[in-house]
Swiss-Prot record:
Protein name: Pulmonary surfactant-associated protein A
Protein encoded by which gene: SFTPA1
Gene3D superfamilies for this protein: Mannose-Binding Protein A, subunit A
Subunit details: Oligomeric complex of 6 set of homotrimers.
Residue spans of biased composition, Basic and acidic residues class: 84-93
Source organism of this protein record: Equus caballus
Pro residues bias spans: 54-65
Length: 248
Protein backbone atom coordinates (compact mmCIF):
# COMPACT_ATOMS: atom_id res chain seq x y z
CA UNK A 1 0.00 0.00 0.00
CA UNK A 2 2.76 2.35 1.01
CA UNK A 3 4.74 1.44 -2.06
CA UNK A 4 1.80 2.23 -4.35
CA UNK A 5 1.35 5.70 -2.82
CA UNK A 6 5.01 6.49 -3.31
CA UNK A 7 4.94 5.32 -6.93
CA UNK A 8 1.90 7.45 -7.70
CA UNK A 9 3.50 10.50 -6.26
CA UNK A 10 6.64 10.11 -8.29
CA UNK A 11 4.61 9.81 -11.47
CA UNK A 12 2.74 13.03 -10.73
CA UNK A 13 5.94 14.90 -10.08
CA UNK A 14 7.47 13.71 -13.27
CA UNK A 15 4.44 14.78 -15.25
CA UNK A 16 4.42 18.30 -13.81
CA UNK A 17 8.17 18.70 -14.45
CA UNK A 18 8.78 19.71 -10.89
CA UNK A 19 11.92 18.52 -9.12
CA UNK A 20 11.70 17.66 -5.52
CA UNK A 21 14.17 16.19 -3.14
CA UNK A 22 12.77 13.42 -1.05
CA UNK A 23 14.41 14.99 1.97
CA UNK A 24 12.72 18.35 1.39
CA UNK A 25 9.40 16.65 0.85
CA UNK A 26 9.68 14.85 4.07
CA UNK A 27 10.67 18.07 5.90
CA UNK A 28 7.61 19.87 4.66
CA UNK A 29 5.24 17.18 5.71
CA UNK A 30 3.91 17.51 9.28
CA UNK A 31 3.81 14.32 11.24
CA UNK A 32 1.62 13.27 14.12
CA UNK A 33 2.93 14.56 17.58
CA UNK A 34 4.49 11.86 19.65
CA UNK A 35 3.86 10.99 23.29
CA UNK A 36 5.68 13.35 25.81
CA UNK A 37 8.79 11.83 27.28
CA UNK A 38 9.58 11.24 30.96
CA UNK A 39 10.99 14.19 33.08
CA UNK A 40 14.76 14.41 33.06
CA UNK A 41 17.11 14.28 36.06
CA UNK A 42 17.56 17.44 38.26
CA UNK A 43 20.25 19.82 37.02
CA UNK A 44 23.32 20.97 38.96
CA UNK A 45 23.20 23.94 41.45
CA UNK A 46 23.79 27.32 39.85
CA UNK A 47 26.46 29.84 40.94
CA UNK A 48 26.01 32.14 44.03
CA UNK A 49 24.15 35.35 43.23
CA UNK A 50 25.26 38.96 44.05
CA UNK A 51 25.18 39.95 47.77
CA UNK A 52 21.91 41.73 48.63
CA UNK A 53 21.32 44.92 50.74
CA UNK A 54 21.22 44.64 54.58
CA UNK A 55 17.79 43.96 55.94
CA UNK A 56 16.04 46.13 58.60
CA UNK A 57 17.02 45.65 62.31
CA UNK A 58 15.15 42.95 64.06
CA UNK A 59 12.97 43.44 67.15
CA UNK A 60 14.53 43.89 70.62
CA UNK A 61 15.22 40.56 72.19
CA UNK A 62 14.07 39.52 75.64
CA UNK A 63 16.03 40.78 78.72
CA UNK A 64 19.24 38.99 79.52
CA UNK A 65 20.41 37.75 82.87
CA UNK A 66 20.52 39.57 86.23
CA UNK A 67 22.34 42.99 86.31
CA UNK A 68 25.94 42.84 87.38
CA UNK A 69 27.43 44.46 90.49
CA UNK A 70 28.23 48.24 90.41
CA UNK A 71 31.60 49.17 88.99
CA UNK A 72 34.36 51.07 90.81
CA UNK A 73 34.09 54.85 91.33
CA UNK A 74 35.46 56.89 88.44
CA UNK A 75 38.07 59.64 88.66
CA UNK A 76 37.04 62.92 90.33
CA UNK A 77 36.19 65.54 87.72
CA UNK A 78 37.35 69.18 87.79
CA UNK A 79 35.62 71.50 90.29
CA UNK A 80 32.56 73.32 89.00
CA UNK A 81 32.08 77.09 89.01
CA UNK A 82 31.28 78.70 92.40
CA UNK A 83 27.60 79.01 93.19
CA UNK A 84 25.75 82.10 94.32
CA UNK A 85 26.51 83.42 97.77
CA UNK A 86 24.01 82.25 100.33
CA UNK A 87 22.25 84.28 102.98
CA UNK A 88 24.17 85.42 106.02
CA UNK A 89 23.87 82.90 108.82
CA UNK A 90 22.88 83.56 112.39
CA UNK A 91 25.72 84.67 114.69
CA UNK A 92 27.21 81.85 116.68
CA UNK A 93 27.53 81.63 120.42
CA UNK A 94 30.19 83.73 122.04
CA UNK A 95 33.33 81.77 122.68
CA UNK A 96 35.21 81.56 125.95
CA UNK A 97 37.58 84.39 126.84
CA UNK A 98 41.08 83.96 125.50
CA UNK A 99 44.26 83.91 127.53
CA UNK A 100 45.63 87.27 128.66
CA UNK A 101 48.08 88.98 126.32
CA UNK A 102 51.73 88.47 127.09
CA UNK A 103 53.14 91.77 128.35
CA UNK A 104 56.06 92.72 126.13
CA UNK A 105 58.20 94.95 128.32
CA UNK A 106 60.20 96.30 125.39
CA UNK A 107 57.02 97.20 123.48
CA UNK A 108 55.50 98.86 126.53
CA UNK A 109 58.63 100.94 126.99
CA UNK A 110 58.55 102.02 123.31
CA UNK A 111 54.88 103.03 123.52
CA UNK A 112 55.55 105.00 126.70
CA UNK A 113 58.36 106.91 124.98
CA UNK A 114 56.20 107.67 121.92
CA UNK A 115 53.34 108.87 124.11
CA UNK A 116 55.72 111.15 126.01
CA UNK A 117 57.12 112.61 122.77
CA UNK A 118 53.62 113.28 121.43
CA UNK A 119 52.64 115.10 124.60
CA UNK A 120 55.79 117.22 124.39
CA UNK A 121 55.10 118.06 120.73
CA UNK A 122 51.48 118.94 121.44
CA UNK A 123 52.57 121.17 124.28
CA UNK A 124 55.07 123.00 122.07
CA UNK A 125 52.52 123.48 119.28
CA UNK A 126 49.87 124.68 121.70
CA UNK A 127 52.24 127.37 122.93
CA UNK A 128 52.59 128.56 119.31
CA UNK A 129 48.80 128.70 118.96
CA UNK A 130 48.73 126.17 116.09
CA UNK A 131 47.23 123.16 117.90
CA UNK A 132 44.83 122.52 120.78
CA UNK A 133 43.68 119.24 122.36
CA UNK A 134 40.11 119.05 123.67
CA UNK A 135 38.91 115.72 125.02
CA UNK A 136 39.65 113.11 122.35
CA UNK A 137 39.99 115.71 119.59
CA UNK A 138 42.99 117.70 118.41
CA UNK A 139 42.43 120.95 116.46
CA UNK A 140 45.32 122.18 114.33
CA UNK A 141 45.99 124.90 111.75
CA UNK A 142 48.85 125.56 109.35
CA UNK A 143 47.92 129.24 109.13
CA UNK A 144 46.93 129.04 105.45
CA UNK A 145 43.92 130.99 104.15
CA UNK A 146 42.21 129.13 101.27
CA UNK A 147 38.71 128.23 100.00
CA UNK A 148 36.49 125.47 101.41
CA UNK A 149 37.44 122.72 98.93
CA UNK A 150 41.17 123.36 99.42
CA UNK A 151 40.75 123.11 103.21
CA UNK A 152 38.83 119.84 102.85
CA UNK A 153 41.57 118.41 100.62
CA UNK A 154 44.50 119.48 102.82
CA UNK A 155 42.84 118.09 105.96
CA UNK A 156 42.11 114.77 104.22
CA UNK A 157 45.75 114.50 103.07
CA UNK A 158 46.85 114.92 106.68
CA UNK A 159 44.45 112.18 107.82
CA UNK A 160 41.86 114.51 109.37
CA UNK A 161 38.85 116.61 108.35
CA UNK A 162 37.65 120.22 108.56
CA UNK A 163 37.21 121.21 112.20
CA UNK A 164 33.64 121.43 113.49
CA UNK A 165 32.66 121.94 117.15
CA UNK A 166 30.11 119.63 118.74
CA UNK A 167 30.18 121.20 122.18
CA UNK A 168 30.73 124.56 123.84
CA UNK A 169 34.25 123.54 124.87
CA UNK A 170 35.22 122.55 121.32
CA UNK A 171 33.72 125.77 119.94
CA UNK A 172 35.86 127.79 122.36
CA UNK A 173 39.01 125.90 121.32
CA UNK A 174 38.45 126.60 117.61
CA UNK A 175 37.58 130.23 118.37
CA UNK A 176 40.91 130.66 120.16
CA UNK A 177 42.76 129.60 116.97
CA UNK A 178 40.61 131.99 114.92
CA UNK A 179 41.38 134.83 117.33
CA UNK A 180 45.09 133.96 117.31
CA UNK A 181 45.25 134.38 113.51
CA UNK A 182 42.73 137.26 113.49
CA UNK A 183 40.68 135.88 110.59
CA UNK A 184 37.53 133.86 110.07
CA UNK A 185 37.59 130.07 109.59
CA UNK A 186 35.39 127.62 107.72
CA UNK A 187 33.69 124.86 109.75
CA UNK A 188 32.97 121.29 108.62
CA UNK A 189 29.31 121.95 107.77
CA UNK A 190 27.30 122.14 104.52
CA UNK A 191 23.75 123.21 103.72
CA UNK A 192 21.32 120.44 102.73
CA UNK A 193 18.55 120.44 100.08
CA UNK A 194 16.35 122.62 102.31
CA UNK A 195 17.60 126.18 102.76
CA UNK A 196 18.76 126.84 106.33
CA UNK A 197 19.27 123.14 107.21
CA UNK A 198 22.94 122.33 107.73
CA UNK A 199 24.63 118.95 108.18
CA UNK A 200 28.03 117.56 109.08
CA UNK A 201 30.16 116.52 106.10
CA UNK A 202 29.26 112.86 106.70
CA UNK A 203 25.56 113.71 106.27
CA UNK A 204 24.61 113.52 109.95
CA UNK A 205 22.33 116.27 111.33
CA UNK A 206 23.92 119.03 113.42
CA UNK A 207 23.53 118.56 117.20
CA UNK A 208 25.29 121.77 118.32
CA UNK A 209 25.12 125.29 116.86
CA UNK A 210 26.30 128.79 117.80
CA UNK A 211 24.72 130.99 115.13
CA UNK A 212 25.09 134.74 115.13
CA UNK A 213 21.65 136.29 115.81
CA UNK A 214 19.51 136.19 112.66
CA UNK A 215 21.68 133.58 110.92
CA UNK A 216 21.57 131.58 108.77
CA UNK A 217 19.84 133.77 106.22
CA UNK A 218 21.55 132.93 102.93
CA UNK A 219 18.33 131.33 101.63
CA UNK A 220 20.18 128.50 99.89
CA UNK A 221 22.82 130.69 98.22
CA UNK A 222 25.42 130.37 101.01
CA UNK A 223 26.21 126.68 101.43
CA UNK A 224 29.12 126.84 103.90
CA UNK A 225 29.57 128.08 107.49
CA UNK A 226 32.28 130.37 108.86
CA UNK A 227 33.24 131.19 112.45
CA UNK A 228 33.79 134.78 113.58
CA UNK A 229 36.60 135.71 115.95
CA UNK A 230 34.08 135.74 118.80
CA UNK A 231 33.13 132.10 118.09
CA UNK A 232 29.71 132.79 116.52
CA UNK A 233 28.65 131.27 113.18
CA UNK A 234 27.48 132.71 109.87
CA UNK A 235 26.49 131.03 106.59
CA UNK A 236 28.79 132.03 103.74
CA UNK A 237 29.68 131.17 100.13
CA UNK A 238 32.19 128.31 99.88
CA UNK A 239 34.42 130.32 97.51
CA UNK A 240 35.72 132.78 100.14
CA UNK A 241 39.24 132.44 101.58
CA UNK A 242 39.22 131.42 105.23
CA UNK A 243 41.65 129.99 107.81
CA UNK A 244 42.23 126.24 107.42
CA UNK A 245 41.65 124.39 110.71
CA UNK A 246 41.60 120.58 110.80
CA UNK A 247 40.53 118.17 113.50
CA UNK A 248 42.05 114.77 114.30
Amino acid sequence: MLLCSLTLTLILLAVSGTKCDVKEFCAACSGVPGIPGSPGLPGRDGRDGVKGDPGPPGPIGPPGGMPGSPGHDGLIGPPGPPGERGDKGEPGERGPPGPPAYPDEELQTTLHDIRHQILQLMGALSLQGSMLAVGEKVFSTNGQVVDFDAIRESCARAGGRIAVPKSLEENAAIASLVTKHNTYAYLGLEEGPTAGDFYYLDGAPVNYTNWYPGEPRGRGKEKCVEMYTDGQWNDRSCLQYRLAICEF
